[in-house]
């Protein structure tokens, strides 16, 4: 009887999760109690799969702040442990709860230990029974194998749990990165729209100032015209009210002046053609922005390499070049055209860099094979700027003429030994709605293309060289021309 009561109490204070006696028991709002460690682990699992905390038994939701220590249960568990460790209670465990006899037999059919009276009862009649000592080793081995199996499964379960947690952390990082990228992309779009709005409003303000200025001038003209008419009216009234002499004095001149009076109508602007505002092509802008973002993934770290002799000054960090007026004694023999190369050389892959050309009146940039002796005093520098001579460049002249330089005839591999032909290049005019302060250069060596982007104008394509012949390593090329303002290599975050 005592064992049965003890077993009943044990059931009441057993954790439904780990099936062991409660350790640091916590009670939920629904009244069920669990080990602190068990309910904490269950809380994490519930939030992961269900998005809310719920009781493992009745599934009623609960709040973590409502978990409360159950000291009464903890006290019962503590006393139960003491009772279970007493020798007399241990002895009761070894005896049959029904008959009080010692448990010496094992029933194979029921898989349980029984006493000799149980064996003779109707319940176990015909069952195979053995002495506990005879089957103990057999089942000890089975349980040992089961223990090893469960330990391995525990390791596998822990690994699966760790894998899930790692995947969860990885997904959180990935989602956070995607959120950051999305926010950055839309911020960039908002910045573009804000810039477009600002430009449109500035243009409208300029138009308003211009029209109002002309209308004010027109108003002044109308005021003068009205005053002139009033003077004539006043003269006529004076003559009509005066004597005959005053009436006829220079009457022909007065009549002629009156006949010549022609009212000038004020200038109006209602019929003039005004620039109609059109919302920007967002689809096109997004496509262009996507293309620019794609090539910017291949941002290369380029530094400028001094060439001697050269009419340029390079900054200490190798990121800026400016024109320097030549020293007199170097004017006699010039073996190199003004310009510098970027490092490292390019022999494969995709490469992108950006150049700040703000406020410069002239510049040239792009890609070239090398600074060979491609210029001298008697040859204009632009004649070298041809793909057949190893230059794929665009440039600005006279603060407004943008151009690309193509070969004047079919390409010949000048590095293979053919003589340089110094005929003028084919000039391709480039039209810019927004003048570029930053120019992006993208080189795809395998695709044999070089593209130039107007970063200032949301990354619109300026020009593209196709079917380029790269027989040898190529280099980024920079020429500040005779404008003393610098050309500066930009960093990805600038």
UniProtKB/Swiss-Prot annotation:
GO terms for cellular component: nucleus; P-body. Residues 280-494 form the B30.2/SPRY domain. Its main location: cytoplasm. It holds the Pfam family zf-B_box. Its EC number is 2.3.2.27. It is an enzyme of class 2 (transferase). GO terms for biological process: activation of innate immune response; autophagy; defense response to virus; innate immune response; positive regulation of canonical NF-kappaB signal transduction; positive regulation of MAPK cascade; positive regulation of NF-kappaB transcription factor activity; protein K63-linked ubiquitination. It is found in: Cytoplasm; Nucleus. GO terms for molecular function: pattern recognition receptor activity; ubiquitin-protein transferase activity; zinc ion binding. Keywords: Acetylation, Antiviral defense, Autophagy, Coiled coil, Cytoplasm, Immunity, Innate immunity, Metal-binding, Nucleus, Transferase, Ubl conjugation, Ubl conjugation pathway, Zinc, Zinc-finger. Zn(2+) binds at residues 96, 99, 118, 124. Pathway: Protein modification; protein ubiquitination. It catalyses: S-ubiquitinyl-[E2 ubiquitin-conjugating enzyme]-L-cysteine + [acceptor protein]-L-lysine = [E2 ubiquitin-conjugating enzyme]-L-cysteine + N(6)-ubiquitinyl-[acceptor protein]-L-lysine. A zinc finger (RING-type) spans 15-59. The modification N-acetylalanine is found at residue 2. Capsid-specific restriction factor that prevents infection from non-host-adapted retroviruses. Blocks viral replication early in the life cycle, after viral entry but before reverse transcription. In addition to acting as a capsid-specific restriction factor, also acts as a pattern recognition receptor that activates innate immune signaling in response to the retroviral capsid lattice. Can form homodimers and homotrimers. In addition to lower-order dimerization, also exhibits a higher-order multimerization and both low- and high-order multimerizations are essential for its restriction activity. Interacts with BTBD1 and BTBD2. Interacts with PSMC4, PSMC5, PSMD7 and HSPA8/HSC70. Interacts (via B30.2/SPRY domain) with HSPA1A/B. Interacts with PSMC2, MAP3K7/TAK1, TAB2 and TAB3. Interacts with SQSTM1. Interacts with TRIM6 and TRIM34. Interacts with ULK1 (phosphorylated form), GABARAP, GABARAPL1, GABARAPL2, MAP1LC3A, MAP1LC3C and BECN1. Belongs to the TRIM/RBCC family. This is Tripartite motif-containing protein 5. It comes from Saimiri sciureus (Common squirrel monkey). The gene is TRIM5.
